[in-house]
Regions:
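Alpha-helical transmembrane segments
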Residues: 180-190, 232-243, 316-331, 401-411, ...
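Hydrophobic alpha-helical transmembrane segments
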Residues: 82, 133-137, 152-156, 220-225, ...
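Generic alpha-helical transmembrane segments of integral inner-membrane proteins
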Residues: 86, 90, 137-141, 160, ...
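Transmembrane alpha-helix interface/packing and boundary motifs in multi-pass membrane proteins
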Residues: 141-149, 226-235, 279-290, 417-418, ...
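Juxtamembrane and boundary regions of transmembrane helices in multi-pass small-molecule transporters
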Residues: 39-41, 46-104, 111, 186, ...
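Interfacial loop-to-helix junctions that mark the boundaries of transmembrane helices
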Residues: 72-77, 105-107, 119-130, 171-180, ...
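Flexible hinge motifs at transmembrane-helix junctions and intramembrane kinks/re-entrant loops
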Residues: 99, 139-156, 173, 237, ...
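Membrane-embedded alpha-helical segments and adjacent helix-loop junctions characteristic
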Residues: 36, 139, 146, 152-265, ...
Length: 592
């Protein structure tokens, strides 16, 4: 049995979340080793899907005291395995698209043919391909939503189903698993692993907290700021795992020795506020960059398929202000409205943070080198486009016109394998043993989502969906954007955000085209909203991790998360409607 919240000392709380391979077919009681105590280290990169499923089981242990662990989820998965094929059959027999919607331009049939059987160019053949594609897409979506099998396994289904049923050739599907934005995310992951390997992320976090202040409100602000900044570059889950033991040390300090004259209620409020602040800041910070969270990179990759390019700097200039505003509102709600922390100083808190800082010692050579690579990479991402557009410089340095964000990310990743941490005897900044901890499942999810979108386009299913929304263009754009954001925010409370975005992007793109809207009006709010699931522990791995600390009750998380869901549902449409056109490559405004 796990120790009670009152007996959990700060030094004993170090989470090590296993890869999802260890979670499958494992006895329920064994899932307790998801939460390891006694100062054990943290795995450098955590699989979000595995973390979410594993922590769901661990949290259910806390709630049910070890009885009937995981039965609900296991039942949900079993039904999902059956429901996927059954729903596919139902869609195939019930979906009867009009043949007139599939007129084929002369000379286009051979290019779009997906298999030898599809060489017949009659509209009936295209209607049949559309029916099959719709059925198989529903099968994949159901398995993603229910997690009937591990999400990366479902992401491999397009490679089997679509060529197997003669919809497209294997090459058409497989090429999407090598999209350049998958390699952008891979490079970002390797940079994050190097930061974690040499403890640079911990130093940045402690320095940020020390710089903000030591009153309860300032401490929450410092933790949220540090968490949000790190999650811009590092996995949201790994950032939360790293920040949690520091936060729990601070909560323990409040319980043992406090300079405040308040009651135990104040200590409890501070603990809840700090834990929620860490979880929410991890999700919010990831919104700010393309490498901060998988839905952002998936959006960029999908748009790249359609000839719409979003650069790292363009996204950051648009999304960073949104993340900052949402972070400030979240801090204000937590510390002033919902939990009302006092503004008095707690001198012993500063001593605790300084003690943790001193344990790190002076910055080592590897830390300086990793920091240099990180800063150079971030600067290159931000300055690449302005420098390439500077005719005087680009004329003398033609390389500027040839590189892109993925090239920069891979160059940075490769350099980490070439720069020694010690010129005489030390290892390199990154080796393959450390780099192999990459969340390969997330990269497969990218490929699965992009391949599904490509097949929907190739089979004309996306075109048919768009034709059903031809009248949508008459509606006010703002309310369309708001409806998309609101739907995705609450939908991702119960489903994986990456799986949700993978399934919705091709549908929303088709809807936008059918309604004569620029696709960015629908796709951008969907990607942003996927990071704003704040209500339930199972909504995101950061939520699950802090809920498992024992300092948060379900009611407190639901109540606080509902406030933030509403705030995000208002902020995202406002930012997209009034700001996105100034930074992102809109081709048509559709605005008044």
């Amino acid at each position: 049995m796990a120790p009670s919240a009152s007996n959990r000392t700060a030094s004993s709380w170090h989470f090590a979340v296993r890869d999802d391979r260890r979670l499958e077919n494992q006895p329920a009681g064994d899932n307790l080793d998801l939460l390891r105590y006694a100062g054990q280290g943290v795995h450098p990169m955590v699989s979000p899907a595995g973390c979410q499923r594993g922590l769901f089981l661990a949290l259910e242990f806390f709630v049910n005291d070890g009885q009937q662990v995981g039965r609900t989820e296991l039942t949900w998965r079993r039904w999902g395995r059956i429901a996927g094929p059954l729903c596919a059959l139902a869609v195939y027999f019930l979906f009867q698209p009009s043949i007139s919607a599939f007129s084929v331009p002369a000379g286009a049939s051979q290019r779009s043919a997906g298999s030898p059987a599809s060489s017949i160019t009659a509209p009936q053949q295209h209607a049949e391909r559309t029916r099959v594609t719709a059925a198989l897409a529903v099968w994949i979506a159901v398995w993603w939503i229910t997690e009937a099998v591990p999400l990366p396994v479902t992401a491999l289904l397009p490679l089997v189903l679509f060529p197997g049923f003669g919809v497209v050739r294997f090459q058409t599907v497989a090429q999407e698993y090598a999209n350049k934005y998958i390699f952008l995310f891979m490079g970002g992951f390797m940079l994050a692993i190097a930061m974690q390997r040499w403890n640079l992320h911990r130093r940045i976090a402690l320095l940020t907290v020390l710089s903000v202040g030591t009153s309860p409100r300032q401490l929450v602000a410092g933790f949220m700021l540090a968490t949000a900044f790190l999650s811009m570059w590092i996995s949201n889950t790994a950032t939360t795992v790293m920040m949690l033991p520091i936060g729990l040390s601070l909560i323990e300090l409040f319980q043992q020795k406090t300079d405040l004259s308040g009651s135990a209620r104040l200590e409890q409020s501070f603990g809840v506020c700090l834990m929620l602040g860490i979880a929410y800041a991890a999700s919010i910070g990831g919104m700010a960059t393309l490498v901060g969270t998988p839905p952002n990179a998936l959006l960029a990759g999908y748009l790249h398929q359609r000839g719409i390019l979003i650069g790292f700097a363009e996204w950051m200039f648009f999304a960073l202000p949104l993340a900052v505003v949402l972070l400030i509102i979240t801090w204000f709600l937590l510390t002033r409205i919902l939990f009302a922390l006092p503004a008095v100083d707690v001198s012993t808190a500063a001593g605790l943070i300084r003690a943790e800082w001193k344990k790190l010692g002076p910055m080592s050579r590897p830390e300086w080198l990793v920091l240099s690579v990180f800063m150079a990479t971030a600067a290159a991402w931000i300055l690449r486009k302005p420098l390439a557009n500077w005719e005087v410089l680009s004329g003398h340095v033609p390389l500027l016109a040839r590189v892109d964000d993925t090239w920069i990310a891979l160059l940075a990743a490769i350099s980490l394998f070439l720069i020694p941490s010690d010129l005489k005897r030390g290892p390199f900044l990154l080796d393959w043993e450390a780099a192999s901890a990459l969340p390969w499942g997330v990269l497969l999810l990218f490929g699965g989502g992009l391949s599904l979108a490509a097949v929907m386009e190739e089979s004309q299913l996306a075109r048919w969906i768009g034709s059903q929304f031809a009248e949508m263009g008459d509606l006010p754009v703002f309310w369309i954007v708001a409806a998309v954001a609101l739907t995705v925010i609450f939908f991702t409370e119960i489903t994986s955000n990456l799986a949700t975005v993978s399934a919705l992007l091709p549908v929303l793109f088709a809807v936008a085209r059918g309604g004569d809207l620029d696709p960015l009006w629908l796709l951008v709010p969907a990607a942003l909203a996927a990071s704003c699931a704040f209500m339930l522990p199972v909504a995101t791995p950061p939520n699950a991790i802090v809920f498992g600390s024992g300092h948060i009750r379900m009611g407190a998380m639901v109540r606080t998360g509902l406030w933030l869901n509403v705030v995000a549902a208002v902020l995202i449409p406002l930012f997209v409607y009034f700001c996105a056109q100034h930074f992102l490559p809109f081709q048509q405004s559709n605005s008044p």
